[in-house]
Regions:
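Sec-dependent signal peptide recognition
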Residues: 2-10
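Short coil/turn motif common to extracellular beta-sandwich-like domains
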Residues: 43-51, 224, 281
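Short, compositionally biased P/S/T/A/G/V-rich stretches that sit at domain boundaries
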Residues: 18-45, 49
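Active-site-adjacent mobile loop/cap segments within catalytic or ligand-binding domains
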Residues: 395, 402, 414-416, 445-511
Length: 511
């Protein structure tokens, strides 16, 4: 139940005026007001409150924002959550003073809407949807020559222009576009399924082909590390792989079997049985029954066939010898800056380097997505996850509150997973990082992150702590803070490697 406006406002004032944190080292510098957040022109959420953080340069200064006193920590930093004045263009007036010296800044904001996103376009905003009949080849333009990962990644289609991600479509695939807007085209995948992609990612000079291509029967091969299921096809087609309880459902679009191939048994774990079926005109499914949770899976095209590679999970072990771990220090570009100016990307790199050293001492092989402050795109990080031989992929981050949420909301550790093979890793990292950092475990969540899309490894994203909280930022400035975060990551990996339940299949969903 929402709080009455006056009570909510009073609680915000009490929060802003809380006592200074004695764990933060004192700093007696010059008066210098630096507002890290919000930035001028920032969209103010419809909740009518805004988080703010920054520094006044000295712990001996006082700060007022819109005539509300905001607590200044011993090192001069501040972090608070204040009500906004009404109107379409609210403002925040900061007044910092120490003795006879004072600094005044005004931040102009613009009113936003609840749960809004600048990326959330619609067909209407792109112009009228009109019929279109043309074969196209998916091909992304290489816009950044410094980052050649772009041409290796699929194009992620959406259920509507600017909407939720649908399925990945490999570059080079030829599909039929039956409608378009000014900037997007609609692709026919099957008789009952279609998706949207940017027009810029399509070569519209493609030759026509039959609407449905005949697929060969599934062929199975295996070795000590993986199993390979292959479908012969005249050319590459888009496909998806979904883990549903104790089954992997491999759906291939634009294919058909004139006679359904026979089912067959798998020869060993993790595959129990393979059942092919025509799901709908233009969509075939290879239903792969599982004995245990695979380490990962991916599809690839080579030698005239579409292949599903299913990795065997390593056996539980107390030793890390033979384990390959990919660590991804989150950002740059972007990333959050803490109240005193500590950058998220500098901390995540330091943590990754320490964690890598600790893991190598235990016998693991470690791959780092970056070893310097040079920006690296999400596409390039995802390529490392999918092209490497890593068993685990862990993306390291620090947290900041979303619009309309107070800084206190990120006091603790959060983890994210996307594919089910990363769920156990996310759970164990949540427990161990929060325990090491001496802070709450906020929770683990399933999230759609670009770096977690590849299912080839068990992958998780860790928000180790809230960098916008002055005490946490001050701790992360120290070597002890870096070592502590890194040790929590290592402990989570060690527990994953030992745990038999990390290889357990998720509970089956009823169909």
């Amino acid at each position: 139940m929402p709080l009455p406006p006056r009570l909510a406002y009073a609680l915000l004032i009490v929060s802003a005026c809380s006592a200074p944190d004695s764990r933060i080292p004192a700093l007696d510098g010059s008066l210098a007001l630096e507002i890290r957040y919000p930035r001028p022109g920032e969209a103010a959420p419809a909740e009518d409150s805004v988080a703010l953080w920054g520094t006044v340069g000295t712990g001996r200064a006082k700060l007022m924002v819109n005539r509300v006193r905001v607590n200044v920590e011993p090192n001069g930093t501040f972090s608070s959550f204040l009500a906004l004045p009404p109107g379409r263009s609210p403002s925040l007036r900061f007044v910092a003073h120490r003795g006879n010296d004072s600094v005044v800044r005004t931040i102009l904001l613009r009113r936003g809407t609840p749960n809004s996103s600048a990326d959330e376009g619609t067909p209407v905003s792109e112009g009228t949807v009109r019929e279109w009949g043309r074969w196209v080849t998916m091909r992304r333009l290489l816009s950044d020559t410094a980052d050649r990962a772009t041409h290796l990644r699929p194009i992620y289609s959406r259920w509507r222009p600017g909407g939720e991600v649908a399925i990945p479509i490999p570059q080079g695939v030829r599909l039929f576009a039956n409608a378009r807007t000014d900037r997007s085209i609609r692709l026919r995948l099957a008789s009952d399924e279609q998706v949207w992609v940017p027009l810029a990612d399509a070569d519209t000079t493609a030759r026509a082909r039959p609407m449905l291509l005949r697929a060969g029967p599934p062929q199975l091969r295996s070795d000590s590390t993986e199993m390979l299921i292959s479908l012969a096809l005249p050319e590459r087609l888009p496909s998806t792989v979904e883990l549903s309880g104790d089954r992997l459902l491999w759906t291939v679009y634009g294919a058909e079997w004139t006679t359904r191939p026979a089912s067959r048994d798998g020869d060993s774990a993790p595959i129990r049985r393979i059942v092919p079926r025509n799901a709908a005109p233009g969509r075939v499914v290879v239903d792969v029954g599982l004995v245990s949770l695979p380490l990962g899976w991916r599809t690839e095209w080579r030698e005239g066939a579409l292949h599903l590679r299913v990795r065997r999970a390593p056996l539980p072990s107390k030793s890390l010898h033979g384990l390959v771990v990919a660590l991804d220090p989150g950002h740059p570009p972007d990333g959050t800056t803490g109240p005193s100016g500590l950058s998220e990307d500098s901390v995540t790199l330091a943590v990754a380097l320490v964690a890598a050293d600790k893991l190598r001492q235990r016998g693991a092989t470690v791959i780092l997505t970056r070893t310097s402050g040079r920006p690296l795109s999400l596409e390039a990080r995802a390529v490392v996850a999918e092209q490497s031989r890593a068993h685990l992929f862990i993306s390291l981050h620090l947290n900041a509150p979303g619009p309309g949420r107070p800084p206190s909301a990120v006091y603790g550790t959060q983890t994210y997973w996307m594919n089910a093979n990363g769920s156990a890793l996310a759970r164990l990292l949540l427990v161990e990082v929060s325990k090491a950092m001496g802070q709450p475990a906020i929770g683990m969540y399933q999230g759609e992150f670009a770096v977690l899309r590849p299912a080839w490894t068990a992958a998780a994203l860790v928000e180790g702590s809230g960098i916008v909280i002055p005490e946490r930022e001050a701790f992360l400035r120290t070597q002890a803070g870096i070592d502590t975060y890194a040790q929590g990551v290592v402990n989570g990996i060690v527990r994953w490697n030992r745990a038999a339940d990390a290889r357990a299949l998720p509970v089956s969903r009823r169909r």
